[in-house]
UniProtKB/Swiss-Prot annotation:
InterPro entries: PsdUridine_synth_cat_dom_sf, PsdUridine_synth_TruA, PsdUridine_synth_TruA_a/b_dom, PsdUridine_synth_TruA_C, TruA/RsuA/RluB/E/F_N. Its EC number is 5.4.99.12. It catalyses: uridine(38/39/40) in tRNA = pseudouridine(38/39/40) in tRNA. The gene is truA. It comes from Streptomyces griseus subsp. griseus (strain JCM 4626 / CBS 651.72 / NBRC 13350 / KCC S-0626 / ISP 5235). Substrate binds at residue 123. PANTHER family: PSEUDOURIDYLATE SYNTHASE, TRNA PSEUDOURIDINE SYNTHASE-LIKE 1. This is tRNA pseudouridine synthase A. One of its GO terms (molecular function) is tRNA pseudouridine(38-40) synthase activity. Homodimer. The keyword Nucleus does not apply. Formation of pseudouridine at positions 38, 39 and 40 in the anticodon stem and loop of transfer RNAs.
Length: 284
C-alpha cells in the first residue's frame, strides 16, 4: 500500500458519511452489502470503467457502525480524473444509495494515505438510560441501557485508561497485528435535554472491537456492577476477560479523522507502519 499514486494516476481523497444499519461493515465481502463495495461499484459505473478502483480507508468500521467523518482514498487514472473531476460528486450522489454520501473528492497532497497518515480517529458512542427507553427517532444511533448510569463513576474509570497501553484485553486478536494503542481521550458527557450519554473515544488507531469493549466495561461501572478500578485492572491483565461485554454496534459513530500538515504526511505514514512495543518491553 504505497503513499504515492503510481505514475499516470491521481490519488483522490474522499470525505464521506454513512448509516451503517444495513451494511455488513466497510470492507467488501462476497455476497454481502458493504460500504466499500457500494462506492467502488458506483465509481466504476459513473466513470464508465471496466476495472474496479480499490479504496483505502481510515477506519474499517464493523457491521452496523456509522460514520460521519470517514476518509478514504482511491487512485484513478489521470485521464479518468480529468474527464470526471467536475461532475464526479453529483454523479456519485445520483448513483449511490441514500445511506452513503460522498461530500468531497479532491486530489490528495503528496504522501497522503487515508489509513497510515492519520494522526487520530475520534468515535462517539451514545447510550440512553431512561426507564422508558430511547427516543424512537434516534433509536438507530443510541443504545438503551436498562439500568441508571453514574456519569462520575464512568469518567473516573475512563481516566485510568488514557495513555499508551497494550489493549489486548479489549481487542479481538488478529494474527500479526499489535494491540498497543495510544488512547488519547475517553470522556463521557450527559445531554441535559435528552439524558443521552455520549462517550468521546479518540486514539491514534483502534484494534478490532476495542471501542465497543471499552464502552461495555464502562457501562458495568456506570450501573454499579463493577468498581471504577475494574476496567484498568482488566487492561493490565492483557488477556480477554469474559466479564467485558462488546456492546451493540448501532450506538457507535466514527466522527472525525485528523491528519498532519501536508509536509508531514509521508513521515506519519512511515511511523504508523512500525511495529509498536511498549517502553521497556523486551524483544523476545
Amino acid at each position: 500500500m504505497s503513499d504515492q499514486a503510481e505514475p499516470g494516476f491521481v490519488r483522490v481523497r474522499l470525505d464521506l458519511s454513512y448509516d451503517g444499519k444495513d451494511f455488513s461493515g466497510w470492507a467488501k465481502q462476497t455476497s454481502r452489502r458493504t460500504v466499500q463495495g457500494e462506492i467502488e461499484d458506483a465509481l466504476r459505473t459513473v466513470t464508465r470503467s471496466s476495472v474496479t478502483y480499490d479504496l483505502t480507508v481510515a477506519g474499517r468500521t464493523d457491521a452496523g457502525v456509522h460514520a460521519r467523518g470517514q476518509v478514504a482514498h482511491v487512485d484513478l487514472p489521470e485521464a479518468v480524473w480529468a474527464e470526471h473531476e467536475e461532475k464526479l460528486l453529483r454523479r456519485l450522489a445520483g448513483r449511490l444509495p441514500l445511506d452513503v454520501r460522498i461530500w468531497r473528492a479532491a486530489p490528495a497532497p503528496a504522501g497522503f494515505n487515508a489509513r497510515f497518515s492519520a494522526l487520530w480517529r475520534r468515535y462517539a458512542y451514545r447510550v440512553g438510560d431512561r426507564p422508558g427507553g430511547v427516543d424512537p427517532l434516534t433509536r438507530g444511533h443510541v443504545l438503551w441501557h436498562d439500568r441508571p448510569l453514574d456519569l462520575d463513576a464512568m469518567n473516573e474509570a475512563a481516566a485510568l485508561m488514557v495513555g499508551e497501553h497494550d489493549f489486548a484485553a479489549y481487542c479481538k486478536k488478529r494474527e500479526g497485528a499489535t494491540t498497543i494503542r495510544t488512547l488519547q481521550k475517553l470522556r463521557w458527557v450527559r445531554d441535559p435535554a435528552t439524558g443521552v450519554l455520549t462517550a468521546t473515544v479518540q486514539a491514534d488507531a483502534f484494534c478490532h472491537n476495542m471501542v465497543r469493549a471499552l464502552i461495555g466495561a464502562a457501562l458495568f461501572v456506570g450501573d454499579g456492577r463493577r468498581p471504577a478500578a475494574w476496567p484498568a485492572e482488566v487492561l493490565a491483565a492483557k488477556v480477554r476477560d469474559p466479564g467485558v461485554h462488546v456492546v451493540r454496534p448501532h450506538g457507535l459513530t466514527l466522527e472525525e479523522v485528523a491528519y498532519p500538515a501536508d509536509a508531514l504526511l509521508a513521515a506519519r505514514a512511515a511511523e504508523a507502519r512500525n511495529v509498536r512495543t511498549l517502553p521497556g518491553a523486551g524483544c523476545c
